[in-house]
Amino acid sequence: MSDSTTWLGDRYELLDIIGRGGMAEVWQARDHRLGRLVAVKRLRVDLASDSTFQARFQREAQSAAGLNHPNIVAVYDTGETTDPTTHMPVPYIVMELVEGHTLREVLRDGRKILPERALEFCVGVLNALAYSHAAGIVHRDIKPANVMLTRNGSIKVMDFGIARAVADTSATMTQTAAVIGTAQYLSPEQARGETVDNRADIYATGCLLYELLVGRPPFVGDSPVSVAYQHVREVPSPPSTLDPEVTPAMDAVTLKALAKDPEHRYPTATQMRLSLIHI
């Protein structure tokens, strides 16, 4: 790789690619000004010419840059570089480099997660959400792949990639063929294409808690459409029917978070967090 592609802004040296998502690549990089390792999320070059994706990426940067909380992956800097081949502007975000594993990796490892640990993980997520919701930002994409378990055992939520200020939630999100958000953690109102608020994050956290407790999400299917339909129409089985170690109190919190009607869920992340702490 040439020098023009391994350096960003004469400050960040890209070292190793550590992740690829639907719209971006994540690199481990060295910040030569401050002498530290960081993570750089860079829009995929093949998407850089797409103004819709560029706007989405910039929105991510603006949303995340204002969030400063121990349970949220910190955003340090944003910028833009020119791709030497296409000469298109390629936006990037510089973030805290977190050592650890995503909860998706933890779940795929196959080892049973103790119910008490599942509750602790979700308390960390809800701490992050209480903070972002107070700032007017709905995450919209809470799922195991977006939650990091650090080496010291703390939780960090990342990738506010489709987060928007609540004031913007009436905007349509049907520009792309794929439903934005992951089907297994999609709230019924998102599945129907309706306006969402912080209670969509409560629902997704309920899906996450369910999967951490029993090893699979509340709804599975052959296609995203079939899963989305279940979110809208089907009642999930109580987690305790799949794992006898799950207590009635755990069932109650999980199923309240998974209520079809947002009015029947926890109204705030703080209230769901308190219910988990009191179990």
Segments and roles (model prediction):
Residues M1-I277:
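Eukaryotic protein kinase
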